Design a protein with these regions (language model features):
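Membrane-interface loop-to-helix entry segments
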Residues: 73-84
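Membrane-anchoring alpha-helices and their flanking helix-loop junctions
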Residues: 1-68, 85-143
């Protein structure tokens, strides 16, 4: 999926730089806002992915237990959120309608994958995971 995103993003961005066409969205946004969005998205994505891998790998146990510390105390799917934020950074760079559509498709894909995984986690962890679901948002901290 990530390869598909970069292929579409690259082709879309290439059209802007080579042929000079643009979208209304690109013309409406200022460079500082785009730069800030890119920077924040990239930093958050690297942080979330690194911290979530560390939290999970340090707490591997048999039988399985719920990891609800570190970034898993903020959102239920920090690895997926990190990947989505990484793609969002490239969306800020290209700011095209095609990139926005691809990012939305990515979000839907990751949301469905997370929902499927949560069904399996409920089977494995039971009430412990359903209580975790009630405490935390799937994607956004505090929501």
């Amino acid at each position: 999926m990530l390869i598909l995103f970069f292929v579409v993003w690259g082709a879309d961005s290439l059209g802007f730089f080579m042929f000079g066409y643009s979208t209304v969205v690109f013309e409406a946004l200022a460079f500082p806002l785009l730069f800030a969005g890119t920077f924040v998205s990239l930093c958050l994505s690297f942080y979330l992915v690194a911290k979530s891998h560390k939290a999970v790998l340090e707490q591997v146990s048999d039988p399985p237990k719920l990891v609800d510390s570190d970034v898993y105390a903020w959102v239920r799917h920090p690895m997926y959120l990190g990947t989505l934020l990484f793609c969002l950074a490239f969306l800020f760079i290209s700011v095209s309608l095609v990139s926005i559509a691809i990012w939305i498709a990515f979000f839907i894909f990751y949301d469905r994958m997370a929902t499927y995984e949560e069904k399996n986690l409920i089977e494995i962890l039971g009430e412990q995971y359903t209580a975790y679901q009630k405490r935390l948002s799937k994607w956004l901290p505090g929501v």
